[in-house]
Amino acid sequence: MELATLVTLFVSGLLMSFTGYALYTAFGQPSQQLRDPFEEHGNELK
């Protein structure tokens, strides 16, 4: 394969891995440990 193809595949793989990890953190098991700033402040915005 050409160098440009390998670099493109590598960068695409990194991007897909980062996106998958971000989605897992946002919606998967670790998301239960995230704090919700709106719940902490309640109805102070009214």
From Swiss-Prot:
Top-level taxon of the source organism: Eukaryota
Annotated membrane topology: Single-pass membrane protein
InterPro entries (UniProt xref): PSII_PsbN (IPR003398)
GO cellular component annotations of the record: plastid membrane; thylakoid membrane
Residues spanning the membrane: 5-27
GO BP: photosynthesis
Broad class of the protein's primary localization: plastid
Subcellular localization, as worded in the UniProt entry: Plastid membrane
General function of this protein: May play a role in photosystem I and II biogenesis.
Family per similarity comment: Belongs to the PsbN family.
The protein's name: Protein PsbN
Organism: Cuscuta obtusiflora
